[in-house]
């Protein structure tokens, strides 16, 4: 059982908003493995049974960023290293995008995002690799002005 809650991250330069809306949680039925939707309603948390699934939104249909707790990130990383295909390509791509985007806005440690990307040595699908490449390009563009950038560049 997992507790799902919502969290808002206001970006600098944008006015804070108290607006809330229902969030669809795309899951699979434990027994039939058929897709189901559980709605996280305003001002609430949900306790859900994900069965054997380790990530939300296996098909990458959601319009929200998903941030997992540290324990679940470690479980996801372990599963990706043992068998990347245990998580569908769409979910692996989304995991990469969410992790790096959340790190870019300061809502997640870059250590989690970078640790997730290590499994890509075994990746056979292009979309997760392409997503990592886009985020690393962005990260490098932000670091080029740093006085120690040349030391970082040697590692690339």
At which residue positions do the language-model features occur?
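Non-catalytic accessory/interaction domains
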Residues: 1-156
């Amino acid at each position: 059982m997992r507790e799902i809650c919502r969290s808002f991250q206001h970006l600098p330069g944008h006015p804070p908003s108290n607006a809330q809306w229902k969030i669809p949680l795309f899951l699979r039925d434990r027994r039939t493995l058929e897709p189901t939707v559980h709605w996280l309603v305003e001002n609430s948390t949900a306790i859900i049974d994900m069965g054997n699934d380790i990530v939300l939104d296996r098909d990458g249909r959601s319009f929200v960023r998903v941030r997992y707790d540290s324990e679940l990130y470690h479980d996801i990383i372990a599963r990706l290293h043992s068998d990347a295909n245990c998580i569908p390509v769409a979910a692996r791509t989304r995991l990469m995008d969410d992790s790096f985007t959340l790190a870019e806005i300061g809502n997640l440690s870059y250590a989690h995002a970078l640790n997730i990307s290590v499994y890509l040595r075994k990746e056979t699908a292009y979309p997760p690799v392409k997503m990592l490449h886009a985020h690393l390009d962005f990260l490098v563009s932000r670091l080029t002005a740093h006085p120690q950038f040349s030391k970082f560049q040697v590692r690339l």
